[in-house]
Amino acid sequence: MMCSNNISDYKLLEILKNGMIGTVYKAEDINNKCLAVKKVSMDQPMEKLTLLFNEVLTVRRLQHRNINTIVSCFLYKQYVYLTYKFMCFGNCEVLLKNVYTSGFPEVAIALILKDVLSALTYIHSEHYVHGSVRAKHILLSPRKAVLSNFSYCQSFISQGEKKTFIFGSTVGIEKELYWTAPEVLYQNLSGYTEKIDIYSIGITCCEMANGFQPFKDTELTYMYIEKVRGSLQVLLDKNSLLENQGSLSLEHTNKRIARDVIVNKSFSENFHQFVELCLNKNPLSRWAASKLMTHSFLKQCRNTSLLDQLKDLGQKMSKFKRNEHEIFSDARGSHNPQPNDTIWKF
């Protein structure tokens, strides 16, 4: 897919997201084709720009249908512009807040995870760790899910040699820690491997199935203690309720979930087992991404597709109004810079 490196060839239609580093717009190119354009100011702390450069350099090396590939990247005046293929359903976190408020259907989760695991299998085979898997970083279209946000991606290759372990933190902001594996939180000399992404998959399963992030509204210290102890997050359904003798008080939120919401849910035993495998405290006992793709939980993907499962999503999305952090209705036509030559591209 060829894409122009001249900002005057794009019409920025509306703001999709105001992120930590930049703003993402829905845009059209000169052929009226929709795409996403990320606009990043160079006038910000170097640590944020380093995250941007890390993402660009990493994604340029990775080519996979389930990775949110950068189509082009260029500089105009004091802004860096990155263009991506447009994923019309946005990210899974926004969908949880506005459409699937009680969680995604299990079959939809299986289809989404199949694509994400395919991306992780490839990423790990290229000796990288994504380091930030969560619903917010999974984008959807009618035909596929893609993994995005490679700002915290790390490589096992250093100075031409492959390391066995990675040391240090993969996350730079507090709110990402809820999805982080315990071995990263330890910050000890043992380091960690690509299995931290598998743990994050387990947390993301709970997030997408239950309708909210695990450990929501709890202190970081409590979350840290629970993970170090090996306390498992669970899929909340009638089976969870029965196992807890009819009363399930959630340790990871200050609010009690309505009992009738839980009793009306029933996840398969395969799904429960899949999550337990991902959230094993011992990283050596977690399955690799490639092995998880053979798990019985994903067999339900065989006779359906994302297109089948999400066919009514467009209509559902039209019924909710996104807040100011997700879309600005007055953004149309007001964000285009004046035409000029591109200074550089990479």
Curated annotation (Swiss-Prot):
ATP binds at L16, K17, N18, G19, M20, I21, G22, T23, V24, K38. InterPro entries: Kinase-like_dom_sf, Prot_kinase_dom, STRAD_A/B-like. Keywords: ATP-binding, Nucleotide-binding. The keyword ATP-binding applies. One of its GO terms (cellular component) is nucleus. Residues 10-298 form the Protein kinase domain. SUPFAM superfamilies: Protein kinase-like (PK-like). GO terms for molecular function: ATP binding; protein serine/threonine kinase activator activity. CDD domains: PK_STRAD. The keyword ATP-binding applies. One of its GO terms (biological process) is positive regulation of TORC1 signaling. The protein kinase domain is predicted to be catalytically inactive. PANTHER family: SERINE/THREONINE-PROTEIN KINASE FRAY2, SERINE_THREONINE-PROTEIN KINASE FRAY2. Belongs to the protein kinase superfamily. STE Ser/Thr protein kinase family. STE20 subfamily. This is STE20-related kinase adapter protein stlk. It comes from Drosophila melanogaster (Fruit fly). The gene is Stlk.
